[in-house]
């Protein structure tokens, strides 16, 4: 039963007088829903949420689904991920007893046991209760003591804790004492940054970089900091010294210090647009000013400096120093030599037709390169000349001894492998996280040793429990053919008979309830990962889960992403539609039993599947979406995404943007599958008005629309496990009822 069948007329269908604006653009009759916390808008939201409570949430299955998911999220058996700070290992943890979460620490010896002894550092539930705030943890940064302080036995003391009210991107930063386990009040000289988008970063124990909202004119059009300052303890914020000021057109300005002993350096980062950045070396001159030296690489490149090395990851081809380097390559040069004018590079990675760079992680002596090969991870250890023993050279020699390649033994052939350095300043230890759709996540500890080939076998430290019975289930990877002939990979997960389909010897019925998920933007790759919630609420109930690796993502490097930018956005949607058709052609499901879901940029994908390909789906979930592409640059952080979608205020660009703006593509005369819109009032990244307005427009035309908006949660949708379980249950029950 749909919402419009169970409720009387309400603001859900109310539009306002339609008159054109002075600039000629059509009036938006649902503009009032952009008032995030306006009385009328919130009344509309509450009415929609009440409809969900009266329909989806009343079924017995809803409570069971919510409970099953909550058990996964609250499980004490989950892997507690840790970060090494000094000789302790810190973890932030949520469970049934710690709804907001607890920041805690232990030793490595204790962490290796089945039941570690945790020392509470900060109880967020107690803090929220004491201060009357719905605090959501945004993380902490800790100042590394100097070598002299460490030699004298001084502890790691100075932390900067970031907390968000309700889960918004805007947060506060407060200084915290790790020894005394308390906040350092501003009246006691503690650093405190008021709520805004921005941050603080340690320079030394009495100085920080601050980039935040300093008042009128100090934010970019995207709502991010435009000014970075150096702030001294005990002085007012307005006395902080400006280090760098961006332009009115920039996206984000920030600064930080690298505290690696012997390689202490300061940097200023200028983000001009989403894929256009500048990095400056900031050197003290003995005056309040700092001398800035631009790192002379393409603005489209990703740049990193570690100890004596400069790493450059290319998004575009680059000709320099008499050589041309391909987009997607990873280059290395000695940083000081580069600053002196040397443009010789060593190629550490060069992409192929099936491979792309997923990441590069430094340890004390090595660089671990993570490569995706047809969306499967492969790891390589590269050792720079100063630490290398004789062995096979990597890439091209650049007036220097070669880097040396070695391999990590004992890794799975399939699935996802994520890499994290335990302590990149002092050790060559690695955390390895391995996972796939049906295998619970495992955390291993690996010591690479100082020299190539010294690595031992990974030591399994923690494993998640099996939250669902995967016996009889399987994972398959297939390729669909898009409209222009491009092969698009996708993974299918579920019972073996259902995954096999009804054709070519398969024993399936061809009508399996199937959820197809995608994203397709911002260079983000979708790789296999275990989800206890998905397994319990969908796979164990006979559902099939599919992940489409469409263009716009990062699965095959920069070219794969750039193929779906701006005027070519339609390629991402054609890819997704091709996967949907391939699932039907393989006899796995039918359009009536095929649902799809996308969030954020994936919500834009979902909106386009809904409005451009409604015949392919039996249900659509549109989560925290962009939908009104005429106004997206004017809403919250939207201006920062013009490099991805284009500028709707440019008439020529609007001509192609309008072809993927679901709010404008909706046609009251067309038939659409049932749709669920979800968002959060506290989302200050993607405006909740996107979801509100299209839902209202469709409800006004009598379409089958379900709408749920969490009052907290930010762009992630939920502020705690209870909210996350509830939101997920809404999703799965909607799909179960619509897809059969």
Role assignments for model-derived ranges:
Residues 201, 209, 266-267, 280-281, ...:
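Structured core elements
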Residues 96, 166, 193, 201, ...:
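Active-site-proximal structural scaffolding
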Residues 353-376, 432, 436, 480-488, ...:
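C-terminal substrate/ligand-recognition segments
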Residues 120, 242, 544, 704-706:
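Conserved beta-strand segments of alpha/beta enzyme cores
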Residues 1-429, 435-439, 445-446, 454-455, ...:
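Beta-propeller folds
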Residues 126-147, 155, 163-168, 182, ...:
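Cap/lid segment of the alpha/beta-hydrolase catalytic domain
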Residues 534, 547-740:
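Active-site-proximal cap/loop segments of hydrolase catalytic domains
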């Amino acid at each position: 039963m749909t919402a419009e069948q169970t409720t009387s007329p309400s603001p859900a269908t109310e539009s306002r007088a339609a008159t054109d604006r002075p600039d000629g653009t059509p009036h938006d009759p649902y503009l009032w829903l952009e008032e995030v916390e306006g009385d009328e808008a919130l009344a509309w939201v509450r009415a929609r949420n009440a409809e969900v409570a009266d329909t989806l949430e009343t079924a017995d299955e809803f409570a069971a689904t919510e409970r099953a998911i909550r058990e996964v999220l609250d499980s004490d058996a989950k892997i507690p991920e840790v970060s090494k700070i000094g000789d302790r290992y810190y973890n932030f943890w949520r469970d049934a007893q710690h709804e907001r979460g607890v920041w805690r620490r232990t030793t490595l010896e204790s962490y290796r046991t089945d039941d570690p002894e945790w020392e509470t550092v900060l109880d967020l539930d107690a803090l929220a209760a004491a201060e009357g705030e719905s605090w959501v943890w945004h993380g902490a940064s800790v100042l590394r003591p100097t070598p002299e302080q460490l030699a004298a036995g001084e502890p790691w003391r100075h932390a900067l804790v970031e907390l968000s009210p309700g889960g918004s991107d805007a947060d506060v930063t407060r200084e915290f004492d790790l020894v005394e386990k308390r906040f350092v009040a501003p009246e006691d000289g503690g650093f405190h940054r008021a709520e805004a988008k921005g941050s603080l970063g340690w320079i030394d124990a009495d100085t920080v970089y601050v980039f935040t909202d300093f008042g009128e004119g100090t934010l970019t059009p995207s709502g991010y900091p435009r000014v970075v300052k150096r702030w001294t303890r005990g002085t007012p914020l307005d006395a902080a010294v400006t280090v760098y000021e961006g332009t009115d057109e920039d996206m984000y300005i920030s600064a930080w210090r690298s505290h690696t002993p012997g390689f202490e350096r300061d940097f200023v980062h200028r983000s001009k647009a989403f894929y256009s950045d500048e990095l400056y070396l900031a050197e003290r001159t003995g005056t309040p000013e700092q001398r800035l030296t631009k790192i002379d690489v393409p603005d489209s490149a990703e740049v990193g400096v570690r100890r004596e090395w400069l790493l450059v990851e290319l998004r575009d081809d680059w000709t320099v120093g008499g050589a041309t380097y391909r987009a997607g390559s990873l280059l290395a040069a000695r940083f000081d030599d580069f600053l002196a004018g040397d443009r010789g590079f060593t190629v550490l990675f060069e992409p192929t037709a099936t491979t792309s760079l997923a990441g590069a992680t430094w340890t004390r002596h090595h660089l671990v390169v993570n490569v995706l090969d047809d969306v499967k991870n492969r790891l390589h250890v590269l050792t720079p000349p100063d630490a290398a023993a004789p062995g096979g050279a990597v890439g091209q020699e650049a007036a220097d001894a070669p880097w040396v390649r070695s391999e990590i033994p004992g890794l799975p052939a399939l699935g996802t492998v994520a890499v994290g350095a335990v302590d990149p300043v002092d050790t060559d230890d690695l955390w390895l996280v391995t996972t796939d759709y049906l295998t619970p996540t495992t955390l291993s500890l690996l010591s690479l040793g100082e020299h190539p080939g010294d690595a031992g076998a990974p030591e399994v430290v923690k494993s998640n429990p099996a939250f669902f019975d995967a016996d009889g289930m399987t994972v398959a990877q297939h390729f669909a053919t898009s409209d222009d002939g491009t092969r698009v990979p996708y993974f299918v997960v579920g019972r073996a008979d259902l995954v096999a389909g009804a054709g070519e010897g398969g024993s399936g019925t061809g009508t399996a309830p199937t959820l197809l998920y995608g994203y397709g933007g911002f260079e983000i790759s979708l790789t296999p990962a275990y989800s206890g919630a998905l397994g319990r609420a969908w796979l164990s109930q006979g559902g099939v889960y599919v992940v489409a690796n469409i263009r716009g993502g990062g699965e095959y490097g920069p070219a794969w992403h750039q193929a779906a930018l701006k005027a070519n956005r339609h390629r991402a949607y054609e890819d997704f539609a091709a996967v949907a058709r391939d699932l039907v052609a393989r006899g796995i499901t039918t359009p009536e039993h095929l649902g799809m879901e996308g969030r954020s940029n994936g919500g834009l994908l979902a909106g386009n599947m809904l409005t451009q390909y409604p015949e392919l789906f039996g249900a659509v979930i549109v989560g925290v979406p962009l939908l009104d592409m005429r106004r997206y640059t004017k809403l919250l952080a939207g201006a920062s995404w013009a490099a991805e979608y284009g500028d709707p205020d440019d008439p020529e660009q609007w001509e192609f943007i309008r072809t993927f703006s679901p709010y404008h593509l909706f046609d009251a005369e067309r038939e659409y599958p049932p749709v669920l819109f979800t968002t959060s009032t506290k989302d200050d990244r993607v405006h909740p008005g996107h979801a509100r307005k299209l839902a209202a427009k469709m409800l006004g035309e009598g379409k089958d629309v379900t709408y749920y908006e969490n009052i907290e949660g930010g762009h992630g949708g939920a502020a705690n496990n209870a909210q996350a379980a509830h939101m997920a249950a809404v999703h799965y029950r909607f799909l179960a009822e619509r897809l059969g």
